[in-house]
């Protein structure tokens, strides 16, 4: 792979916010004109592997913030573990990927609520989180009695004062201990739901999106946390690739953007050339007329063995 030249230091920015206009809203003539008049720029390709899910994000990189579309000038990290508030979309994406990387359909999805006697004070999310922590301590006590290690988990605490159920917790946990024993460790209500996780074609992404999405960002709050020792999603960024997985010379990612920005079919074809062990799921092509550049995302999944 060709090495990047020294001095090519790029600034971080929110490329998903910067390029938020779908190419489907433009006709082919304007797409061609925009590409012709766009400045030459370095494109990066980010690969994110999480369990059997695989995502690709292609975006332009810049050296100066004034080159970035205004919508994208806030700086966020994809996997900033200190960002525990799920009002931030990058935190939501990270939690979705963390769940896909660490859990399977052998594991558990728990939803716990409160009866009136045990409701946390309105708005006191820290008090609600303490209840989850007590639950986890009880779970780990029961696991120790059975010779099991501490639980692996990700939990989301949600509060919305306008909902009938103002407080609830979603917990994704390994399924090494009996479900009834796990449920019995929650003492704040008997109105709970405990079930095995079920993967679909997008792995656990649908379930993960459900528990992290915000219905009302102004009045509601969601906070997440996880056990120690979970595997991070594997993230790799490159600036050049071969035309196919194992053939041809390396070309800059921008060369492929010239073809892929023409439509979803072109994106699908290129992804299957690059990643033949994966099935294509979906893609999106976005632009910003601030600088006539593109952001392309694709989702794939590991091909199942026949």
Where does each model-flagged region fall?
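Right-hand nucleic-acid polymerase module
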Residues: 1-165, 175-306
């Amino acid at each position: 792979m060709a090495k990047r030249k020294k001095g090519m230091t790029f600034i971080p920015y929110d490329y998903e916010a910067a390029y938020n206009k779908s190419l489907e809203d433009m006709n082919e003539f304007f797409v061609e004109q925009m590409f012709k008049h766009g400045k030459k720029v370095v494109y990066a390709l980010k690969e994110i592997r999480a369990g059997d899910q695989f995502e690709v994000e292609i975006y332009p990189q810049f050296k100066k913030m004034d080159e970035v579309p205004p919508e994208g000038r806030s700086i966020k990290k994809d996997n900033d573990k200190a960002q525990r508030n799920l009002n931030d979309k990058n935190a939501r994406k990270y939690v979705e990927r963390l769940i896909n990387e660490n859990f399977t359909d052998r594991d558990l999805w728990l939803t716990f609520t409160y009866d009136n006697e045990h409701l946390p004070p309105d708005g006191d999310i820290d008090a609600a989180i303490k209840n989850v922590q007590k639950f986890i301590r009880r779970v780990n006590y029961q696991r120790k009695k059975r010779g099991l290690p501490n639980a692996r988990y990700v939990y989301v605490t949600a509060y919305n004062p306008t909902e009938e159920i103002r407080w609830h917790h979603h917990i994704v946990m390994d399924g090494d201990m009996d479900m009834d024993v796990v449920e019995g460790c929650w003492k704040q209500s008997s109105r709970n739901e405990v079930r095995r996780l079920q993967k679909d074609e997008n792995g656990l992404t649908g379930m993960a999106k459900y528990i992290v999405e915000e219905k009302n960002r102004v009045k509601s709050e969601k906070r997440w946390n996880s056990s120690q020792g979970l595997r991070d999603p594997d993230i790799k960024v490159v600036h050049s690739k071969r035309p196919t997985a194992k053939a041809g010379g390396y070309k800059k990612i921008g060369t492929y953007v010239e073809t892929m920005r023409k439509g979803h079919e072109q994106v699908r074809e290129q992804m299957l050339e690059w990643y033949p062990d994966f099935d294509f799921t979906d893609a999106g092509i976005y632009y910003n007329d601030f600088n006539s550049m593109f952001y392309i995302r694709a989702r794939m999944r590991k091909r199942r063995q026949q």
